[in-house]
């Protein structure tokens, strides 16, 4: 349309946006640490960890990456809906102590009550989920109930650019 990129059609408000690489599942904590160091050597300033889903092992992975990188990059943890509330709280406290930037999707995507409790107990920002039941309306419920600190949208999951614009407006309205 009009020969313009989408960001221009939507009314560009930034000249740059932060980005980060994410891990895939690696065999051992040291492999995550090596991957984070590799990305840092390429100029990345943040790294998101997708661990195995076992709380004890996941904390070991996070610790290995933090020890390898020091405070030179922002770290985020996304265990992809792997934990019970008690496990999520325990892991959340551990990554909070390690200075992680955010904690994403620790609980099932429909556990709003668990996310509310987790947010009340932890200081680390909670990012709950791009897979909310009910799409935009599910995200609104997370915001209204204060179950998340950060909204995340995925164009492939949410149904295109228009739903993402609506999510951005929702986030802006409840800033």
Can you say where each PLM-predicted feature lies in the sequence?
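Short beta->alpha connector loops
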Residues: 25-27, 54, 107-109, 131-134
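A structural preference for long, well-packed, hydrophobic secondary-structure segments
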Residues: 83, 100, 104-107
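Short, glycine/acidic-enriched loop or turn micro-motifs at the edges of active sites
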Residues: 51, 80-81, 107-108, 133, ...
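Catalytic alpha/beta core domains of metabolic enzymes, predominantly
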Residues: 110-175
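Conserved beta-strand positions in the central sheet of alpha/beta enzyme cores
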Residues: 46-48, 104, 152
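N-terminal capping/lid subdomain adjacent to the active-site entrance of alpha/beta enzymes
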Residues: 1-76, 80-97, 121
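Structural recognition of alpha->loop->beta junctions
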Residues: 91-103, 144-151
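Structural detector of well-ordered beta-strand residues that form the stable sheet scaffold
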Residues: 20, 76, 104, 125-129
């Amino acid at each position: 349309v009009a020969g313009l990129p989408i960001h221009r059609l939507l009314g560009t408000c930034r000249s740059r946006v932060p980005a980060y690489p994410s891990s895939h599942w690696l065999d051992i904590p040291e492999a995550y640490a090596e991957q984070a160091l590799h990305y840092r050597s390429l100029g990345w300033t943040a790294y998101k960890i997708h661990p195995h889903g076992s709380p004890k092992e996941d904390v070991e992975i996070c610790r290995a990456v933090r020890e390898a990188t020091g405070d030179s990059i922002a770290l985020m943890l996304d265990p992809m809906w792997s934990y019970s509330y008690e496990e999520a709280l325990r892991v959340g406290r551990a990554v909070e102590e390690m200075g992680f930037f955010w904690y994403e999707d620790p609980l099932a995507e429909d556990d709003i009550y668990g996310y509310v409790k987790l947010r009340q107990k932890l200081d680390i920002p909670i990012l709950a989920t791009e897979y909310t039941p009910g799409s935009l309306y599910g995200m609104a419920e997370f915001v209204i109930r204060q179950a998340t600190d950060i909204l995340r949208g995925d164009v492939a999951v949410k149904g295109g650019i228009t739903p993402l614009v609506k999510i951005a407006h929702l986030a802006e309205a409840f800033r």
